[in-house]
C-alpha cells in the first residue's frame, strides 16, 4: 500500500510540473508585412534568408470579412512599366465599374479576354512563378494605400520598388472602368494622396500588381 501511495504521488508531481511549465509556441498566423515567396510560402521577413527563399511580394492586408475572397492580399515588389489600359478607343472591357468591389482579379481577366488591354497582358506575362497576379480594383488599391507606410520598409528590404510619394511617380491604373463611361475611361489612383482620377484608357500609366492569398 505504501508503494502504491508513492507511485500516485510521483504521477501527481509530474502532472503538476507539466501544467506549470511555461512553453513558448511560435506565432505562425499570417501578418501584415510578412513576405510571399516564389514557392508560394508566406514567412516572416527574418526567415526569408535563413530558409533560402526568394521574396516576390509583401502582405499588405489580412481579410477579416468572410465575404471577401481569400485570406489576404500581397503587393508585388516591383512596378510594371507604363501601359495603356486599352489600345482601342470606344471598347468596353466589361469590368464591374464598381469602386467598392474587391474584384480586381475578375476585372483583369475581363480586360485580358478582350484582347485589347496592354496593361492586362503585361500582368499576365509576369506569371513566371505561378502566382496569379492582377491589377487591383479601386477598393483593393485603397487598402494598399492605407498600408503603404508599413509595407514600404519591407519592399525596400526585399529589393523592390518603393511606392513613391512623388507626384510624377505615384499614379497607377486600377482595373475598374468608370461607370457609364466604360468605353472611354478607367480609374487612375494616386498612392501618394489616395486621390481618384477619371482617365482616358489609351493613356499609358504604371501598374502595381497584387495577389490574393489563400494561406
How should each PLM-predicted stretch be described?
Residues 75, 135-136:
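Short hydrophobic beta-strand that contains or immediately precedes a catalytic carboxylate
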Residues 1-7, 20-21:
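Positively charged n-region of N-terminal signal peptides that target proteins for export
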Residues 14-18:
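C-terminal motif of bacterial Sec signal peptides marking the signal peptidase cleavage site
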Residues 119-132, 138-191:
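An exposed tryptophan-centered "aromatic clamp" motif
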Residues 19-129, 201-215:
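Short, compositionally biased
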Residues 2-3, 13, 167, 203:
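Processing junctions and N-termini across compartments
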Residues 26-27, 103, 107, 163-171, ...:
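Terminal interaction module
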Amino acid at each position: 500500500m505504501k508503494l502504491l501511495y508513492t507511485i500516485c504521488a510521483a504521477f501527481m508531481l509530474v502532472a503538476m510540473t507539466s501544467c506549470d511549465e511555461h512553453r513558448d509556441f511560435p506565432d505562425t498566423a499570417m501578418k501584415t508585412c510578412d513576405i510571399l515567396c516564389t514557392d508560394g510560402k508566406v514567412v516572416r521577413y527574418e526567415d526569408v534568408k535563413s530558409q533560402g527563399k526568394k521574396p516576390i511580394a509583401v502582405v499588405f492586408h489580412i481579410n477579416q470579412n468572410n465575404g471577401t475572397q481569400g485570406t489576404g492580399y500581397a503587393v508585388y515588389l516591383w512596378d510594371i512599366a507604363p501601359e495603356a489600359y486599352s489600345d482601342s478607343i470606344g471598347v468596353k472591357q466589361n469590368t464591374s465599374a464598381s469602386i467598392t468591389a474587391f474584384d480586381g482579379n475578375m476585372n483583369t481577366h475581363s480586360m485580358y479576354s478582350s484582347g485589347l488591354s496592354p496593361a492586362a497582358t503585361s500582368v499576365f506575362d509576369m506569371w513566371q512563378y505561378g502566382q496569379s497576379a492582377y491589377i487591383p480594383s479601386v477598393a483593393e488599391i485603397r487598402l494598399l494605400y492605407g498600408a503603404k507606410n508599413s509595407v514600404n520598409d519591407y519592399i525596400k528590404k526585399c529589393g523592390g520598388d518603393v511606392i513613391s510619394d512623388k507626384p510624377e511617380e505615384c499614379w497607377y491604373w486600377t482595373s475598374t472602368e468608370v461607370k457609364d463611361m466604360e468605353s472611354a475611361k478607367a480609374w487612375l489612383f494616386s498612392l501618394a494622396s489616395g486621390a481618384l482620377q477619371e482617365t482616358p484608357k489609351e493613356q499609358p500609366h504604371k501598374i502595381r500588381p497584387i495577389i490574393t492569398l489563400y494561406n
